[in-house]
């Protein structure tokens, strides 16, 4: 199997070395000579074309966004943005997704052994996902211990054959990963102000989901916000799961709400789509509509099958419109998807099902 060639671009020597060590620990990844700025990176790319670039957001001489635009206009290559958790850094990294970047990762930093191991898994997975991305024109607006692949059982036990509480109010749950930020923009922009309530898990690091939600809120007719514990799930509003926390759909009487909780990685992710979908199967049952969008891996596939078994209607994005046809494909293969449709028709279908 051909190794994924990665070019690291960061002005910090410490970050360059740390990233190189992390990526080199994966037998499927080959690290090219790193670059301290975009000008050196351009020289490296003339010598050897990388499969993936990890790009610092803030650098002297030329910032990451400017270099990203040049890459995408001249020689499109999958780019993973690497950012700190500052407010400006988060906003810029999210903006980069509109210019063609396919993933965001948090810069590695010192922490507990568990934190460092989870960071290693996330960074390597982001690069692998990026290497599979099918780039298209964006319209702006081993030997190592690996994280165990836990199921949603560690957060919420399997639902029974029926939802715990019978309801009539429809609720929509959505899961996405690589390429999902653009897919979610297309989906949410098409919804009217009084759309059904929506809860979303988009794989994204802690600190970036708020900026992502704010950007969507500024361009959509519905309200979009980062979910907080006990937020009411209501019409005309989409809640986006915060990074690094699991988000569950719950119901108390006539009210849907979200529970935000800690816990181990599930299907190698936190937040996990499987956790959200399982909670929807239990608490909404046949009144839920599940949507799984572009992304690498299989997070959400098992949960979507549980939703369908509980009577929910489930939708998978089709291969032609996915950046990475991993998660939807797994859901289809496991019998979790009722229907497979193009991205630009999902909003219309959701509205029809909830009408």
From Swiss-Prot:
Catalytic function, reaction form: [protein]-L-glutamate 5-O-methyl ester + H2O = L-glutamyl-[protein] + methanol + H(+); L-glutaminyl-[protein] + H2O = L-glutamyl-[protein] + NH4(+)
Location(s) in or outside the cell: Cytoplasm
Domain CheB-type methylesterase intervals: 165-355
GO terms assigned for molecular function: phosphorelay response regulator activity; protein-glutamate methylesterase activity; protein-glutamine glutaminase activity
PANTHER family: PROTEIN-GLUTAMATE METHYLESTERASE/PROTEIN-GLUTAMINE GLUTAMINASE (PTHR42872), PROTEIN-GLUTAMATE METHYLESTERASE_PROTEIN-GLUTAMINE GLUTAMINASE (PTHR42872:SF6)
Protein family (similarity comment): Belongs to the CheB family.
Protein's UniProt name: Protein-glutamate methylesterase/protein-glutamine glutaminase 3
Organism of derivation: Geobacter metallireducens (strain ATCC 53774 / DSM 7210 / GS-15)
Gene field: cheB3
């Amino acid at each position: 199997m051909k190794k994924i060639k990665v070019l690291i671009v960061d002005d910090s020597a410490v970050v360059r070395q740390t990233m190189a060590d992390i990526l080199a620990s994966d037998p499927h990844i080959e690290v090219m000579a790193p670059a301290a700025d975009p000008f050196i990176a351009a020289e490296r790319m003339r010598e050897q074309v990388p499969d993936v670039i990890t790009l610092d957001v803030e650098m002297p001489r030329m910032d990451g966004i400017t270099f990203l635009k040049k890459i995408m206009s001249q020689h499109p290559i999958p780019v993973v943005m690497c950012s700190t958790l500052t407010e400006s850094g988060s906003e810029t990294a999210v903006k980069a997704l509109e210019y063609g970047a396919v993933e965001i990762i948090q810069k590695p930093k010192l922490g507990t052994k568990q934190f460092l191991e989870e960071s290693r898994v996330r960074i390597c997975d982001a690069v692998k996902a990026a290497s599979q991305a099918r780039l298209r024109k964006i319209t702006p607006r081993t030997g190592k211990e690996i994280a165990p692949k836990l199921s949603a059982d560690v957060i919420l036990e399997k639902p029974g054959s029926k939802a715990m509480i019978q309801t009539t109010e429809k609720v929509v749950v959505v899961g996405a990963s690589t390429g999902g930020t653009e897919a979610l923009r297309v989906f949410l922009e098409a919804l009217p102000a009084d759309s059904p309530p929506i809860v979303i898990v988009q794989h994204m690091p802690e600190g970036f989901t708020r900026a992502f939600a704010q950007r969507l809120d500024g361009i959509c007719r519905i309200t979009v916000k980062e979910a907080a514990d006990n937020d009411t799930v209501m019409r005309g509003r989409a809640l986006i799961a915060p990074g690094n926390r699991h988000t569950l759909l719950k119901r108390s009487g006539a009210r849907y709400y979200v529970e935000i909780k800690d816990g181990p990685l599930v299907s190698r992710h936190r937040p996990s789509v499987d956790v959200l979908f399982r909670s929807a199967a239990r608490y909404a049952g046949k009144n839920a509509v599940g949507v799984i969008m572009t992304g690498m891996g299989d997070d959400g596939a098992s949960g979507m099958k549980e939703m369908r078994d509980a009577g929910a209607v489930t939708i998978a994005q089709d291969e032609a419109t996915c950046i990475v046809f991993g998660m939807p494909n797994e859901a289809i293969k496991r019998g979790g998807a009722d229907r497979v449709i193009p991205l630009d028709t999902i909003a219309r279908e959701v509205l029809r099902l909830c009408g």
